Amino acid sequence: MTDRQTKILEIVNQKKKVEVATLSKMLEVSQVTIRKDLDALEELNFLTREHGYATMKNMSDISNRMAFCYETKQRIAAKASEIVSDGETIMVESGSSCALLVKQLSETKKDITVITNSSYIARFIRESEGGVTKVIVLGGEYQKEAEVMVGPLVKTCAEAFYVDKLFMGTDGYIPGIGFTSGDMLRVEAAKSMMGSARNSIILTDSSKFSEHGVVMQSKFKDIDM
């Protein structure tokens, strides 16, 4: 994604609905160029094209959440990938930064196995390069908008495995206390996966430090990185 496309996402996110002509003026490029950028962003499932304008999608959709702070999340994913070795099996919980980590591993590592409760991440891997050679999807109740499995079956499935690293996302952070979420079922799924990993690692950008979810996800002392 180009710098201009990132800027377009920021503008559309702020305004929710923006005309092509307005974007053209703001970014000082032709409307033809803007339309091409919008087509590319729609192909990535980051926004919706309508006649003459663009709108953001439902923010509970992981593809749309990925659009926020995209470049920052890419850098986080690249840094996290450095602690994963070729041939390693890891667990990856749902989240936009987690999806970008898996994409990074697909492009830079070899023979990686990913265990996840996210059908989105499983599909995301399919569209990436071949560094991730095996995907194991934990069963459970399917949450359609987040494309993630939750419920007691996630715990049952996770207990069959034990890995060195679990990568998780988060919805918010309370200083001195820990990480929070807005969904109790997803928190329970994450805790089940934490029980099957030696190290639990949070992937998040700084915007989450100003957000406070209503459900406690994990105490700070329970996170290794």
Please provide the spans of the model-predicted regions.
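HTH-adjacent hinge/linker in prokaryotic transcriptional regulators
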Residues: T2-K17, A21, M26-L27, V32-S94, ...
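Conserved phosphate- and dinucleotide-binding cores of soluble alpha/beta proteins
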Residues: L9-V12, E19-L23, E28, E43, ...
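Amphipathic, non-transmembrane alpha-helical secondary structure
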Residues: A78-S81, S85, A99, K103, ...
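Short beta->alpha connector loops
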Residues: G95-C98, S207-F209
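Conserved N-terminal glycine/acidic-rich loop preference
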Residues: S97, I115, V132-K134
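Active-site catalytic microenvironments in core metabolic enzymes, especially phosphate/sugar-handling
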Residues: N117-Y120
